[in-house]
Regions:
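Bacterial N-terminal signal peptides that target proteins for export
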Residues: 2-13
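C-terminal motif of bacterial Sec signal peptides marking the signal peptidase cleavage site
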Residues: 20-23
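N-terminal hydrophobic targeting signals that begin at the initiator methionine
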Residues: 1-2, 25
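Acidic, low-complexity intrinsically disordered segments
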Residues: 165-312
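Low-complexity, disordered linker/stalk regions enriched in Pro/Thr/Ser/Gly
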Residues: 25-167
Length: 312
């Protein structure tokens, strides 16, 4: 069909209109990409941790549990439902208690896939919450550090020192009360007496999950013998080590020496374990059948505390 000059003009106008639409479509998808983990981004901040809840620096708490809550110190990295990327769940953290090893790095995403119980991530607030139990009456130093997925780490991470003094009187406990170890490694705990007076004998009954850990060995270390032999006596002990059922029993007495017996704080025996089960937590328990007696054969134990092993 023969095209008129009017048809040609219409085609030119239509082509121009389509070109405008195409150009606008290109502009709509050509948006700016924001990456707060990239140091080149205008809103980038170095890794920094803001602690919202933990014991007061230098203070003494009267509880065997402590809660620590933290997040990034820059609100641009906090949880925001309008953000295309949830930066809060992608930041990695690790913590350390006293001289123990650093925990593995865990992001919020990683914690949501695990079942650690004691360390959780709240998707609605973007907060990390850590609860530590079985803390004994000693001084503590806690630290937490962050890093980005790009492996840029925090240089000046927060730390705090505090003291636990939860109970008065004679205590029999697993020490340290919190043990952190890598999967498949060997670790140890001590059975410990605190603030005992005129001690002469103990029946210790310890149980553990032998599908999680195996007792490799036990020993009276030098710190134990120094404590137990301070009255210049000698030690008599009987041991029942039932690894098949996860139970260790020790009957120990201090014979001879000073009439006043042993007083103070010290370790009784060291228990050396190997982790053999799944990752997670497991308790090393001291039975209520355990007893501590003084030179007059009186039972003097007032508090018994178990311990917990956390395997990363």
């Amino acid at each position: 069909m023969r095209k008129t000059a009017g048809d040609l003009i219409k085609n030119i106008i239509l082509s121009g209109f389509l070109l405008v639409i195409y150009s606008c479509g290109q502009l709509e998808v050509d948006i700016e990409v924001v990456n707060l983990f990239d140091p080149a981004d205008a809103n980038y901040s170095i890794p920094g941790t803001e602690v919202l809840d933990w014991p007061t620096e230098g203070h003494t708490i009267d509880s065997t549990s402590a809660v620590f809550t933290w997040r990034h110190s820059d609100q641009n990295y906090h949880y925001d439902a309008t953000h295309e990327v949830d930066y809060a769940e992608r930041i990695f953290y690790r913590y350390r208690l006293n001289a123990s090893i650093w925990s593995p790095w865990n992001s919020g995403e990683a914690l949501l896939q695990q079942d650690l119980h004691f360390w959780t991530f709240d998707t609605l607030t973007g907060l990390h919450v850590l609860k530590l139990d079985y803390m004994e009456d000693i001084d503590y130093n806690f630290a937490v550090m962050s890093k980005y997925p790009t492996n840029i780490q925090e240089d000046d991470w927060p730390t705090i020192s505090f003291t636990v003094d939860a109970f008065d009187g004679v205590e029999l406990l697993i020490s340290p009360g919190q043990v952190f170890a890598d999967s498949g490694t060997v670790f140890y705990v001590n059975a410990k007496l605190i603030d005992v007076t005129d001690f002469m004998g103990i029946h210790l009954d310890v149980s553990y999950d032998n599908s999680f850990m195996q007792l490799l060995d036990y020993a009276l270390e030098s710190d134990s013998t120094d404590f137990l032999l301070q009255s210049a006596g000698h030690l008599i002990n009987f041991i029942d080590n039932d690894t098949q059922n996860g139970r260790f029993q020790l009957d120990l007495g201090v014979a001879g020496g000073a009439v006043t017996g042993v007083s103070g704080t010290g370790n009784i025996v060291r228990l050396i374990f190997e982790h053999t089960g799944p990752r997670g937590q497991s308790v090393i328990s001291i039975s209520s059948e355990s007893t501590v007696r003084d030179v007059y054969n009186n039972s003097v134990i007032e508090h018994i505390f178990s311990g917990v092993v956390s395997i990363w």
